Amino acid sequence: MKLQHIALVCLLALSAGNVTAQMLHRPDSMYTFTDPRLQKKHPWRAAAETFGMNVGVWAFDRYVMNEDFAKISIGSIRRNIKHGFVWDNDQFSTNLFAHPYHGNLYFNAARSNGLTFWESAPYAFAGSLMWEIAAEVEPPAINDLMATTLGGIALGEVTHRMSSLVLDDSKRGFSRFTREFLGTLICPMRGLNRMITGEMWKVKRSHYKYHDYDRIPVHFSIGAGDRYLADDNYLFRGEHNPYLEFRVQYGDAFDKVNDGTYDYFTARATFGLSGNQPLISQINLMGKLWGVPLKTTTGMEMMFGIFQHFNYFDSEEVIDGSGRIPYKISEAASVGPGMIYKFPRMNSLVNLEQRVFLSAILLGGSLTDYYNVIDRNYNMGSGYSIKNNTILDFGRYGMFALNMHLYQIFTWKGYEHKDLETIDPLYLNAQGDKGNVMLAVVNPIIELNLSSHFKANMEVSYYYRHTHYSYHEDIKYKTFETRLGLIYQF
């Protein structure tokens, strides 16, 4: 009888061991998002980090850089609250890229502490509001609040999800160091929180991956080559610059299961590698906030959704050129409806996809020909944009794409009836030259497959601007740029 009991206990123990082993090797046990212990939310820690970030940046500006704008007092805070918000005159890259990037840090202070997309959004707003009111003696800027909040949310969610692609808590040594370094470079606040919690150096046997490629596919590529920027639309009067570009398509627009906020987005970032042109020359982000599939009877897949957009194009004067800046275009805060549809396969045409978007621009910017106050040579305003993206994938041969952007931005609040001789430019409170601008960007792309990973890339971008000024002569301007390079598809 005792022998039977011993045999039964051994059998149960062996069975339990097998079940445990199976549980440890189940695909779900690989991913951090399936472990309830790792899904805890820390809103107060996120708030402390947001507050601490502002204090740290202010202290650096005040005591290391000795900046005048950082010499705050109780009186300056009261004055900012009493005076209210204005439109400031910082340079294009500061207002329409650096501020959104700063907002991404506020957003990710919450996102990396377990909060959801929508729960993290108020942190971007609160962090920006605190800075505008209390961290500068200059009047708070309404454009900074908008760009930091809405632009920061877009950049923040994209960088949060991109950092998940490289993190792997099962790795050790140099591989682990490289992954943690890249993850922190992509999303600094996530790296900071992983350092605080010890996750950065903790090695795990389960729940160690942060992204499931089978659940949400990701197409990522790196490109490099030569960019020719024409001056005033002249074919042989321009300059060549090397460039580095990153592209990603995250998720499947037609996935009916993984259809949460930003489970589908596209991103493109181009960096100029010469001293004359801006380091960051182009950023295009589009993320799905909400979407629903539409039924069709033709075999075509269709999806209607609400999308957030962030677009940024920047350039400077061409060397030995006319002295005119080719373009500056920003869509820092924008949201609106869109339709994506995919046609059935037709012979060698593996994929034909069409994307159409209509967006309300809450904050946008464009180069101006007249307004030039402090560091600002561009107008700001609101309006709308229409975008059309056509993609023809020919499988093993290559791909053709046509991207078309149309922006209409209205500058409502001008400066024309103010005395510029006596008014403090910090309190000018103007969006720029009153009027409106129509901007068009047409970008055909040809990619030829050289191997399973390498592609030749050829593209042209045509820029057109027609600015109507209420108190000045209207201006039309057009130019183009070409790119020739190689792409590595992961």
Label every model-predicted segment:
Residues 244-248, 337-339, 386-388, 442-444, ...:
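Membrane-embedded beta-strands of outer-membrane beta-barrel proteins
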Residues 18-97, 103, 107, 111-113, ...:
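N-terminal targeting leaders of membrane proteins
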Residues 1-23:
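Bacterial Sec-dependent N-terminal signal peptides
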Residues 241, 332-334, 381-383, 437-439, ...:
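Membrane-spanning beta-strands of outer-membrane beta-barrel proteins
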Residues 196, 478-490:
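Outer-membrane beta-barrel "beta-signal"
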Residues 232-234, 320-328, 371-377, 426-433, ...:
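Extracellular loop and loop/strand-boundary signature of outer-membrane beta-barrel proteins
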Residues 224-228, 252, 269-275, 308-314, ...:
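Transmembrane beta-strands of outer-membrane beta-barrel pores
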Residues 117-137, 149-153:
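Small-polar-interrupted transmembrane alpha-helices in polytopic inner-membrane proteins
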